[in-house]
Regions:
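N-terminal alpha-helical modules
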Residues: 1-98
Length: 98
């Protein structure tokens, strides 16, 4: 995003990176579900659904609280950051100690 100089360019960069992080999250989620027994699989699915609901509500709040011309960028960065952090969290569960 260093080369992005306009709000539109920054938004595009955020969207692109969010898509990459979402693919990463989906990939590790699928890997983890195949590794888990049925009980923990269900727990992961339930937790992941709740996490998505929380992420979306939290980032919507960021947009509302920020206001102004950069509010949408703030919301996009929120989704990006939370998605990246969740992917890393699931990767740590999938491969502890790495």
């Amino acid at each position: 995003m260093d080369s992005a100089s306009s709000t539109v360019a920054m938004s595009s960069c955020i969207q692109t990176e969010t898509q990459l992080q979402d693919q990463r999250l989906n990939r590790v989620y699928q890997q983890l579900t195949t590794k888990l027994a049925p009980g923990p699989q269900k727990s992961l699915r339930d937790v992941q659904r709740k996490w998505i609901t929380y992420r979306d509500a939290n980032c919507k709040f960021h947009v509302q609280a920020s206001g102004g011309t950069l509010a949408q960028l703030e919301g996009g960065m929120c989704v990006l950051d939370m998605t990246r952090e969740r992917a890393a969290e699931l990767e740590r569960i999938l491969s502890p100690g790495q």
